[in-house]
Amino acid sequence: MKKVLLLVCSMWLATFAVNAQKYAIIDTKYILDKLPEYSDAQRKLDDIAKGWQKEIEDQQAELDKMYRDFDAEQVMLSDELRKKREDQLFNKEKALRDLQRKRFGFEGDLFKKRQELVKPIQDKVYNAVQKLAVQRSYDFILDKSEGITVIFADPKLDKSEDVLRELGIK
C-alpha cells in the first residue's frame, strides 16, 4: 500500500515538474530561407558547384574521346604502345575520380566552402535562438525542420517569427 501511494505521489509530482518546463518550436529551414545572406551564400555555392561540375564534365568528355580514339587505333598499335595508351587512360580515369572526390567528396572543397559561407549565418541564427531562450526562459527549443520528427506542433508554440525579429528580418 505504501509503495502504491508513493508511486502515485511521485507521478503526481512528476506531472508538475513536466508542466513547469517551457519549450518552443522553431523551423530553422524557414528562418534561413528568409535571410538574404543565406540566399546569397546558397547562390554562391551553386555557382561554384556548377563551375566544378563543368570542369569534371569537360575532363570526362576528354577521357571519353581518348577511349574512342584508343578503340579505333587499338588494332594498329604495337603491344608496347597499346600498354602505354592503356596506362594513360587508367591514369586519366584515376585523376578524374580524384578530382570528383576532391571537389564533392566528404570534407571536399564544396563541404569546406559551405562551412566558410553558411556556418557564420547558422551561428548567427543559433545565437538569436539562444538569446530568445534566455529572454523567455525556455527550457527546450525544438527544431522541426529536419533533425527531429514533430508529428504535431501547436502553431502558437512556433517561435520562428520571433527569431527572425531578433535577427532584424520583418
Annotate the PLM regions.
Residues 21-170:
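Amphipathic, charged alpha-helical segments and their helix-to-coil junctions
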